[in-house]
Amino acid sequence: MIMGECQVTTETKTFEPKIAAFLCNWCSYAGADLAGVGRFQYPATIRTIRVPCSGRINPLYILKAMANGADGVLISGCHPGDCHYMSGNYVARRKFALIDSLLKYVGLEEGRVSFSWVSAAEGVRFAEVVKGVTERVTALGPNNGVFKVQDGGGTNE
Amino acid sequence: MKITKEKFGQSFDALAADYQIIAPVSDAGGVNYKAVKSFSEVKQDYLNSKLPPKSFLFPQHEKLLSYKKEGKDVTIKNELKVGKSILFGVRPCDAKAMLLLDKVFKNDEYTDPYYYERRDNSVIIGLACNKISPTCFCSSMSISPASSEGSDIFLIDLGDSYQVEVITEKGKALMAGLEELVELSAEEQALVDTIKSAQTASKVDVSTITAKLDKMFDSPFWDTLHEKCLSCNACSFACPTCHCFDISEEVHKNEGSRVRTWDACMAPLFTLHGSGHNPRDKKKARWRQRMMHKFNYFVHNNGDIACVGCGRCIKSCPVNLDIRQVIDGVNNVELVVD
Amino acid sequence: MVYLKYKTGGEQMSSIVDDIRATARQLLTDGKVDVVIGYEKGSLPLKATPCFVRSPQDIDKLIWDETCENNLAAFSTLTEGKKAIIAKGCDSRALVVLLQENQLVRDDLYIIGVSCQGVINKKKIEAETGEILEASIADGKVTVKGMVCDKEYTFTEVKDASCQTCRYPNPVLEDIHIGGSIDVPQQAAVFADVAEMENKTAGERQAYFQEQMSKCIRCYACRNACPLCYCKECFVDCNSPKWLTGGVDQAENLFFQAGRVLHLAGRCVECGACSRACPQDVDIRALNRKMSKDVFTMYKHESGISMDSNPALNEYSADDPEAFLVKE
């Protein structure tokens, strides 16, 4: 069924992934802002969700995004050492490493969920990261249903 | 009268064209009821399914209706889809359990269309138990390993043939196409008699439990009974008569659906009110409710005990809280006379 | 791997039971505790059941053998008053984590430590013998009369998977130790089972977990049997935000199991209570073991082995591995 959907989408139009991007308020969100102010082009695939700190990202956010049908998830925070709250991203880093490993273990494709550090000064780099992530998710195709809820009732946007 | 399994299988396969046939199959989770296309898929030698066949009539998670709002227009779609079905290989306990579910979902006051449409459109082919599990205690619950109550057609496995009993009109209609019933040999008749007279080894006494429970609401018996319970839903979900559910809305932007999901009295959330008040916030109250509902309230409301002795709750309980021991415990309570 | 100082069954075992009972009697008569949480004989063969002893006349119910598989630490947070708990190695590790997380008051807890040689996994036996009619354990042999066949097993054959890889059979925290202790050779944790799964292709793993998740009925026996799943409101029950719909779709089941495993990251003590509690025999352990392996290899942490070591996710280091970062 998932395969079927996938074929329909790719045959009728080019697949444009929907990517949920959780960005920390102090660095990556500002980086995205800088990319905008500086007019650095990047694909309009991400749906930005601003969080106070990468340490605030609950692992369930990532799972829920995919359950609701996101084709990819991007998570970005301050570079280690630069956290506005001193240690938020250090704590987050441990969580992210475990999440990433577990998701791959249960069979989620590499590249579906991406993590990066982007500072407020890295507008160009933010655009590059989004480009890279978009390319990878596009190559993977739509959410393959490892976590996508098929009949949750009305969540098929 | 009997029919060879070969002939029966041919009719079964032919019926699969018109009916959705639900039968026990062996899958990753053990023996369970699933839709099959051919008799060859049916698991032959099994004690009972791991999960009861009730989920066919009353699914664990069911979309009742869906809706969509566009401008000022709201469209509502009824999600009930029913076709003709056959439930094959239902054990006597589970067939009896369906009669009990009928009392809940179709009574004088209320008829649940989702349950009843499926119920009315399905034929139940019961199958006697040739082997009896040590946790079975149906003989104590006014049925037996070979009782045909609740079945439309009842079969007894004789090795390479089935002894056939047509119980209801529905069963008769289905059997109309089945020819070539032959008489049993003397040996087979003896086998049928043995199977029919079999009793479960495990027994409980429920003769006075309802009256006893009438007076036990405040008994100290409940104070310690629940202690080892983990409050999981394993017993309720494995029970062929448990029927509590929760209805929720799954809404996303301008569309959504109303879904019905199994709920279980063992979970603290079961009775949590919107106000935050929970009338059964303690395990003690929840265990009392479980016993009261099955052995007292249900009897008062519907005239029957809501337990059929299938033993699934005993097998699935992670802490071995055995309902047979709880029944014994209730029987042994000495009531304080005021 | 694990060398025993004493034999399974036999005299040693019965003297352990006697000592447990004597200790329980002493504690109750001295008024040191209100309740002793232990095991009594269950109603099914090869199954012990948790037992709450409050008065000396119930003390003789207490038993100790290879069927005592529940993790009693799960009851420690649910039972009020001062309590004594019979703790195996894994149970004591769970108690350590609970104490570290301030879920228990040390002074209200009396830990009766017993070294454990592993517990029997009934499901393993029943897969072959059918439902067990009768069984006995003697001299390291488990003799089973089943509905399909009769069989004799050595204890090692029917030991639960968690006990096969157990490195802490002796309680790590206890107020009294009963019976002998078990020699464990000093060696690093081995994760052969995880490695085997990791070596499969992503597609194979995906298919495996989808099959496992298709069995899950979301009864939450795993969560409730887990001593460390003590949240007042579990994320699966939360309705604002509503993480899950309550459906039994395999993707949602995986969401639940993966979410649970992530919450147990660096906390899981690998007692295997979740897998044994599962009425549907879902391989929950496969996920927990993976998490344990990652925590161990990345952060050199094993949960609950000492009161002094901080939980892995409560700490960080400037040079933690960053292999998960997106390749640019």
Briefly describe each language-model feature range.
Chain B
Residues 7-11, 235, 261, 322:
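General structural feature for long, well-ordered alpha-helical segments within catalytic domains
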Residues 20, 235, 313:
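Residue-level detector of anion-binding/catalytic polar loops
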